[in-house]
Amino acid sequence: MRTHYCGELRQKDIGETVTLYGWVDRRRDHGGVIFLDLRDRSGIVQVVSDPQRTPDSYELANSLRNEYVVEITGRVTQRPEESLNTRIPTGEVEIYADKIELLNGVRKQLPFQVSTADTETVREDLRLKYRYLDLRRDRMARNIQLRHQVVKAMRRYLEDVEGFIEVETPILTRSTPEGARDYVLPSRVNPGEWFALPQSPQLFKQILMVSGLDRYYQIARCFRDEDLRADRQPEFTQLDMEMSFMSEEEIIELNEKLVSYIFKTVKGVELPLPFPRLTYAEAMERYGCDKPDTRYDLQLVNVSDVMKDSGFKVFRDAVANGGIVKILPIPNGNEQISNVRIKPGGDLFREASEAGAKGLAYIRVREDGEIDTIGAIKDNLSEEQKQEILQRTGAKPGHLLLFGAGDAVTVNKTLDRLRQAIAKEFGLIDPDKINLLWVVDFPMFEWNADEKRLEALHHPFTAPHPDDLHDLKTARAQAYDLVFNGFEVGGGSRRIYQREVQEQVFETIGLSPEEAQNKFGFLLEAFEYGTPPHGGIAYGLDRLVMLFAGEESIRDVIAFPKTQQARCLLTDAPSGVDVKQLKELHVASTYKPKS
């Protein structure tokens, strides 16, 4: 029976006889003495087999190879001074193997090296196909255990400190598409009808508040059939919370304490409370996005009022057509950013184009304080306009000013992308810095140009600000997002709990009373039976752990992720199904493979 994990052994264990299980990380023969690095999920320890001191284990030790599974019993001893290894926690001790038992070998060539000593970069498709090997590697084992520690801290705080209870909500539910596409499943028992996998437990957790379970949480699986990016998966995990009888301030305060507890427990970091706050309008004005990375400055400057009478037609027309003109000031930008990079074909021009911009204007501040730019801009700005630009941006000799002009959405998107790209290039981002902030006072709705209608910016169950009930179309939402180093890691709101307000919101987003009743009648009826004021939040667990682990993709903190084509390379899912199954489900496929 196992007595210890490999990575647990320290000097205090010297003299003990231990039994370990694990994989041979690597084997070395030094002058007839066999050294094995034995690995399990906790780490590595060195095992020694000497023909003189441990003759019973020597022959088998000599035959072992990488990734063989073994049981080893032996005595913990002090390593000689010359072989101490300060790079690993067990580097002061080693095990003299009295007994080795081979539990299983390796019958095929490894597709990649698993050993912690190997620094080879392995293709991601191989890592995902042979995930069981990838998860043995130190980096992945640490990430999965870190994920467990985060979840454990969440549960401990919510249950032991705040009195929340964990409630499971259904995975098979009805389709209420408002946003991303649902994953749908045919019902065999009810032919012609369909279940949907939940995009979130939103409606069920609100029903739980109606039920009197006033502090709910769940580690919830969610499903969205959407285009995938580096930080998205078709199935993902949330910490989902809902609470009754709490104001927006009280919900935010509770969540700051929760997040602070997680950081202290998992990372050993004390976070200053309360977290800073930005309104949505401030975030968009200063950073061009609603999830700004505030580890570095590079704030945008709005000069629309200065440019409305500009002689430069591009700037003047942008303001006249209801758009904006903004500047991204870059200290020392003259030295590092050439005109070639800003003009068509350059990397910064390309970055701007991908955000929808048609061009990229600039002004350079020379060492003598004069400005340098293309003639069309320089000749069409008055001296007063030039001085106002320099004053507002705080530009000094060496500054580069990049302009965005046009509709607000495109300008903000363009300058946000450029801000992030330049911060990385200039080394302005401290990877060890932790900046958390709340973004509050979101608009209730945004305009969907494709469908020519308003849609909820968060979701249609978000409560409007009580001061804005007279005009829902321009109302602020009682919504709040938690931003961690430029990533939204949590989003929540106070909820609508009165039927008439909910019906007004449905009408505003274009749902007829009949559609609202068909999709959400059960919720509207629940509001007739004494619904308490309530609100909540959901945290993206995958994204939060990714940031804790210092990874760049959530695929590296999920045990069995999908690819960006929504495929599982390990099991080769999704796959076809037997025709008999389709008949039982009364389903036929119209898909015709391309020849």
Curated annotation (Swiss-Prot):
It is found in: Cytoplasm. It comes from the Bacteria. It catalyses: tRNA(Asx) + L-aspartate + ATP = L-aspartyl-tRNA(Asx) + AMP + diphosphate. It is an enzyme of class 6 (ligase). L-aspartate binds at residues 178, 224, 458, 495. The keyword Nucleotide-binding applies. Residues 202-205 are annotated as: Aspartate. One of its GO terms (biological process) is aspartyl-tRNA aminoacylation. The record marks 30 as: Important for tRNA non-discrimination. One of its GO terms (cellular component) is cytoplasm. InterPro entries: Aa-tRNA-synt_II (IPR004364), aa-tRNA-synth_II (IPR006195), aa-tRNA-synth_II/BPL/LPL (IPR045864), Asp-tRNA-ligase_1 (IPR004524), Asp-tRNA-ligase_1_N (IPR047089), Asp/Asn-tRNA-synth_IIb (IPR002312), AspRS_core (IPR047090), GAD-like_sf (IPR004115). Pfam families: GAD, tRNA-synt_2, tRNA_anti-codon. Aspartyl-tRNA synthetase with relaxed tRNA specificity since it is able to aspartylate not only its cognate tRNA(Asp) but also tRNA(Asn). Reaction proceeds in two steps: L-aspartate is first activated by ATP to form Asp-AMP and then transferred to the acceptor end of tRNA(Asp/Asn). Homodimer. Belongs to the class-II aminoacyl-tRNA synthetase family. Type 1 subfamily. HAMAP family: Asp_tRNA_synth_type1. This is Aspartate--tRNA(Asp/Asn) ligase. It comes from Nostoc sp. (strain PCC 7120 / SAG 25.82 / UTEX 2576).
